[in-house]
Curated annotation (Swiss-Prot):
Top-rank taxon, per record: Bacteria
Entry-linked HAMAP family: UPF0262
Pfam families: UPF0262
The family this protein is said to belong to: Belongs to the UPF0262 family.
Annotated segments matching region Disordered: 1-22
Family matches, as InterPro entries: UCP032146
Protein name: UPF0262 protein Pden_1958
Length: 162
């Protein structure tokens, strides 16, 4: 596990207002959380001349009033920041991601490896697009590397209806 202070040490997902995820999405979410906790890069920039308490940080993700909420606390639980992102920029990418995931899960059951690989490449491309969008939307609020953004995008998909 990365021991840098610029990381997430805990991730909570508030999906209490949502229907239960499919087994595949639930598995994606578990893997994303595990991978995030194993290795991530998450930095909060100072704002308006104020220093930010050093990490590691605990992240609570939720959707409230059609906005994605990042609630950030220190490892000990002291609130550090909260910011809200519009879901609009993510909606089409999330929809495309769910569609390609459905195709991928179906393909795994019945298609030859070459066709599965082609669908998986498309799935990864859409996933990367979502990660880049997330990095752009987090600009000035939090800095994350592409791998962290990819895993966070997976968690966003678990919170946003496709």
């Amino acid at each position: 596990m990365s021991q840098s202070a610029n990381r997430l040490c805990r991730i909570d997902i508030d999906d209490s207002a949502l229907p239960p995820p499919s087994p595949e999405i639930e598995q994606d979410r578990r893997v994303a959380v595990f991978d995030l906790l194993e290795d991530n890069s998450f930095t909060l920039p100072g704002r308006e001349g104020q220093d930010v308490p050093p990490g590691p940080y605990a992240l609570a993700l939720a959707v409230r009033e059609k906005r994605l909420v990042f609630d950030i606390a220190t490892e000990s639980g002291s609130k550090v920041a909260e910011f809200h992102l519009s879901l609009g920029p993510f909606r089409q990418t999330v929809k495309d991601y769910f569609q390609i995931c459905t195709s991928y899960f179906d393909a795994v059951k019945r298609l030859p490896p070459a066709q599965i690989e082609a669908i998986d490449m498309a799935r990864r491309g859409i996933h990367n697009e979502g990660a880049r969008t997330l990095q752009e939307r987090l600009e000035g609020k939090a800095e994350v590397d592409i791998d962290t953004a990819r895993r966070l995008f997976t968690l966003i998909c678990a919170l946003v209806p496709g």
